[in-house]
A protein has these predicted regions:
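Enzymes that bind and transform nitrogen-containing heteroaromatic metabolites
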Residues: 9-177
């Protein structure tokens, strides 16, 4: 299982709240071959509602999964490849640079969201004040995982009633430091 990455140093304090949003299978899977291994419309609606008006920080695979920069929010893609472009999004070479860019996006006053994938979660989750997690009530095969030790960093504030889509159970939870 994936553990948290080393310390990410931000050059100055960041006034916008830094939060994380993720959907995770019971066995920690968050992706398979660049895609979500499930389709839950209510989870997508939750994601869209929560991140609206803020800035999303994501890796190239997450950008590709969404197909574009989503409207109604800013997007910063962390990619070490300076030749890659991401229409509608800013590019940063590191998570620290992405956080600084996101914080300066004044047209998006909402929180800065860590939205994946695996490496971005490993580096970014320890920096977050709040974690919004969709707990998927099933194991999935996958090749991308959420850090296994995340519960050491947060305390659960609230959990929704269990939902179900096509036999797949899920629950929305909010965790905070």
């Amino acid at each position: 299982m994936l553990a948290f990455a080393g310390v990410v140093h931000i050059p100055w304090s960041v006034p916008k709240p830094l939060q994380c949003i993720v959907a995770v299978a019971r066995n920690g899977v968050i992706g398979r071959e660049g895609k979500l291994p499930w389709h839950i419309p209510e989870d997508l609606a939750w994601f869209m509602d929560q991140t609206a008006g803020g800035v999303m920080i994501e890796g190239p695979a997450c950008y590709a999964e969404l197909g574009k920069a989503l409207p109604g929010r800013g997007t910063v893609v962390v990619s070490r490849d300076p030749a890659k472009s991401f229409p509608g999004a800013e590019r940063a070479a590191s998570l620290a640079e992405a956080i600084v860019i996101a914080d300066r996006m004044d047209q998006w006053p909402g929180p800065v969201w860590i939205t994946g994938g695996e490496r971005i979660y490993a580096e970014g989750t320890p920096l977050c004040e709040r974690l919004l997690i969709t707990r998927i009530d099933r194991d999935f095969e996958g090749d991308r995982f959420f850090p296994a030790d995340w519960q050491k960093l947060f305390t659960k504030l609230v959990s929704s009633k269990a939902g179900e889509h096509e036999g797949l159970g899920y629950r929305f939870e909010v965790w905070e430091r």
